[in-house]
From Swiss-Prot:
GO biological process, one term: biomineral tissue development
Chief place where the protein resides: secreted
Alphabetical list of Pfam families matching this protein: Lectin_C
Function (record text): May form proteinaceous networks during the construction of the eggshell which then may control the deposition of the mineral phase.
Disulfide-linked positions: C5-C16, C33-C138, C113-C130
Residues that bear Phosphoserine: S61, S67
Locations listed in the record: Secreted, Extracellular space, Extracellular matrix
Glycosites: N59
Entry protein name: Ovocleidin-17
Any one of the GO CC terms: extracellular matrix
Amino acid sequence: DPDGCGPGWVPTPGGCLGFFSRELSWSRAESFCRRWGPGSHLAAVRSAAELRLLAELLNASRGGDGSGEGADGRVWIGLHRPAGSRSWRWSDGTAPRFASWHRTAKARRGGRCAALRDEEAFTSWAARPCTERNAFVCKAAA
């Protein structure tokens, strides 16, 4: 593939994004993403531009009309609050410098793992219980 991403993956400035409709817990989804090679994880979203690309991918993959499958059409990303920690991290270990939390006050209190929301056309995320099974998006090195 000329852009360095495999079939079904979308090139972005930060690597390749892949959407998987299989519904897994956050930790199983992260393990699945790591199989794609060194530096592969559940997607970290570094900027508004990257979030737009990701939202386009998800809306194209899922219809994005509010009728997403699974747990209300949520999609895991790599943001989580590790056990015993008060701060959110990406699954690659980096601190989030960009955020797009859903506007409700409780958006950060629903759990320790973050999922994009179908209701917002995948442009915002909210905390969910990490054991919830959702579709997910991986980011791999190009």
